[in-house]
Each structure stands twice: as C-alpha cells, then as structure tokens.
Amino acid sequence: MSWSFLTRLLEEIHNHSTFVGKIWLSVLIVFRIVLTAVGGESIYYDEQSKFVCNTEQPGCENVCYDAFAPLSHVRFWVFQIILVATPSVMYLGYAIHKIARMVEHSDVDRRFRSKSFSTRWKQHRGLEEAEDDHEEDPMMYPEIELESERENKEQQPPAKAKHDGRRRIREDGLMRIYVLQLLVRATFEVGFLIGQYLLYGFEVSPVFVCSRKPCPHKIDCFISRPTEKTIFLLIMYGVSCMCLLLNVWEMLHLGFGTIRDTLNNKRKELEDSGTYNYPFTWNTPSAPPGYNIAVKPDQMQYTELSNAKMAYKQNKANIAQEQQYGSNEENIPADLENLQREIKVAQERLDMAIQAYNNQNNPGSSSREKKSKAGSNKSSASSKSGDGKNSVWI
C-alpha cells in the first residue's frame, strides 16, 4: 500500500467528520503513524540482535527473547493503528456511498423539474372558439432554452459534498453510524491500553532474568537502549490516552450539541406558533417566466373586427414580452421572424375587417340620403299647395 493511497484515504476521513474528529485524525497521523514509522525503525531495528544473554547454551537466547517480548513493540503499535483506524474507514465507505446516492437522487429530481417546466404548451383556444375561419391563433409563446446552455449545464460536474460539522452529519442521516464508529474506536483504544500494560508494563528493564528451558539455570539477558525504549513506550501510552479522550470528547460534543439543537428547535416552534399562519398555501399552477396567456372574458360579443383587434393587441404584447425576457438569448432572430409573420397576418385581417365594416355601413347612409331627399320634396310640394295660408309653428 503506497503512501499516496493512505493520504487520500485520510483526507476523505477528514472531510467527513467533526472538528474533534479532525483533531483526532491529526494526532493519529503525526503521533502514531509518523512516530512509529520513523522512531520505531531507528530504535527497534536491532532489538533481537542486541539481546545478549550470559550463556552459550544453544537456543537459550531465542527462548529468553520470546519470553521478554512475545510481540515486538513496533508490530504491536502497527496492529493498533490498523484496528483503531478500521471503524473510521468503514464509516467513510458508508458515507461516500450514501452521499453519492443522495446526489444521484437530487440530480434526477432536478432533471424532472426542468423537464416539467420546459414542456411545450398548447395554443390557447379562447379566441379560436369565437372565430369562424377555423384557424388557430397562438396566444402563448414558451421561453425556449438554448441548447448550448443546456449542454453546459449537463457538462458541469456536480459539486462535491463535504461534511464540515455535526449538523451536516445529522442532516445526511449519518449520526448513528458515526456514533457507532466512535464507540468501536474507543473500545479498541481501551483494549490496546490494557494489552500494552500486560505485555510491556510501564518500563523497559535493562536486565531480564530468564529461567526457561533449555537454559540450565537462571541467566541474565541484557537489552539494548532500555532508557530510550522506556521513553518511547511512555509516549505511546500518552498518545493512546489522548486519542481515547478525544473520542470521549467527540461523543459528548455530539450528545450535548444534539440536545441544544433540539431545545432551540422547540423554542423556535413556540415562537412561530404565536404568529398567524394561513390554513393553506396557494399552489395554483402557473406558467414559467416568459409566457403570456390571454383569458377569455365572459359574455363578450365577438365579431370579426373585435377578433382582429384583439389578435393585433395580443401580438404586440407578445413582442414586448419577448423583448423583455428574451433580449439576452441567441434565438431572437427566429422568434422575430415568426412574430413579424403573425403581425402581418393580423394586420391583413384587421384591414379586411375594417373594409367589411365600412361596406356594411355605406348602404345605410345612402338610404338615409334618399329618405332625406324624399322628405324635402314632400315639404316643397306641401308648401306650394298651401299658398296664401298662414303656417303655424309650434
């Protein structure tokens, strides 16, 4: 296993823990991994070769060394580091798997919402029902999303989620597994402290008295650098105790922090209960930004002229709406061509309606002129027949 893999692994553990867990990780790296790899190699490299006994009995030194150190100090500490770090590694794997699933579900929900908002709306038939030409007049214009912007959004990788504290761990549903790995880690620390005391005690003696077979009698064996090894042994005791205290501190931090958050939430709920809350929320469906919809008024007398005028006004409103919301988009020329074509059709309809309206009004005016001429002739005739008589005006 290379150091780069171990470094990446510890970095991921650092990103998925509380600040107390980050302190524990720093102690693990500096005072355990580095100290064991550097100091242990230089101190214990000649441990067995420098173990000398005052006898020449074959096999006696090996038996006495086995009695002095059933397990080498360095191997014991390496085994301790592996077992203590195992719960954190297992928690890391679980956290990465769960966060990846959460990110995947959030991406699916986001895509579903974007598809629901980008659906193509059908043309409004409010004015079509009153017309007799059986032609559809579009009353809604969707805000078209650029393909380049959509591709850029799809190409952007999702942001990497990191846990920076206790609240984030609780929000993602990792609190139970995090507390469980703390308990297992603390149990391992206590077990290794007891085992280290039973195997080595608190001091490395310079002389070890051995009476095992095949030694003929009690012999004295001498250990190299006993004082240096004693100091190193005490340092490792201190590091183990420090890691155990950090585990206890982190569990207390999680417990008291959770209690404090619960009390704060209850206090906020009590404060919010005093304010008036509406019994329902207004969840009426609405069109996305950029859409314009015309509502058919009730009991409105539709004529050909009114239809043409309303279509002309609606097209002008659509132009203003598209200029307001779509000024920064690249697909404006295509939309303007469609709008200009529709405006041209609406203007032609308006001219035809005005012409038809004028033609309908001209026969009425001519009949009125004829009637007025007939009335004038009758009045002139009556005036001629009644010459010499006084007319009385009332």
Curated annotation (Swiss-Prot):
Question: Where is this protein chiefly located?
Answer: membrane
- Entry's Gene Ontology cellular component terms: connexin complex; endoplasmic reticulum; nucleoplasm; synapse
Q: How does it sit in the membrane?
A: Multi-pass membrane protein
Comp. bias regions, Polar residues: 356-366
What does the record say about tissue specificity? Mostly in heart and stomach.
Tell me which parts of the chain lie in the Extracellular compartment.
46-75, 200-229
Pfam families membership? Connexin
Protein's GO biological process? cardiac muscle tissue development; cell development; cell-cell signaling; chemical synaptic transmission; gap junction assembly; vasculogenesis; visual perception
Xref: PROSITE patterns: CONNEXINS_1, CONNEXINS_2
* InterPro entries per the UniProt record, alphabetical: Connexin, Connexin45, Connexin_CCC, Connexin_CS, Connexin_N, Connexin_N_sf
Localization of this protein: Cell membrane; Cell junction, Gap junction
Q: Which residues lie on this side of the membrane: Cytoplasmic?
A: 1-22, 96-176, 253-394
Keyword line: Cell junction, Cell membrane, Gap junction, Membrane, Transmembrane, Transmembrane helix
Q: Got any disulfides in this one, which pairs?
A: none
Listed Low complexity bias regions: 374-394
Q: Report the GO molecular function annotations.
A: gap junction channel activity; gap junction channel activity involved in AV node cell-bundle of His cell electrical coupling; monoatomic ion channel activity
Q: Where is this region: Disordered?
A: 354-394
Does the UniProt entry include the keyword Transmembrane helix?
yes
Asked if the keyword Cell membrane belongs to this entry, the reply reads: yes
Family of the protein in this entry: Belongs to the connexin family. Gamma-type subfamily.
Q: What does this protein do?
A: One gap junction consists of a cluster of closely packed pairs of transmembrane channels, the connexons, through which materials of low MW diffuse from one cell to a neighboring cell.
Assembly, in brief, is: A connexon is composed of a hexamer of connexins.
What's the protein here called?
Gap junction gamma-1 protein
Q: Which organism is it from?
A: Gallus gallus (Chicken)
Taxonomy of the source species: Eukaryota, Metazoa, Chordata, Craniata, Vertebrata
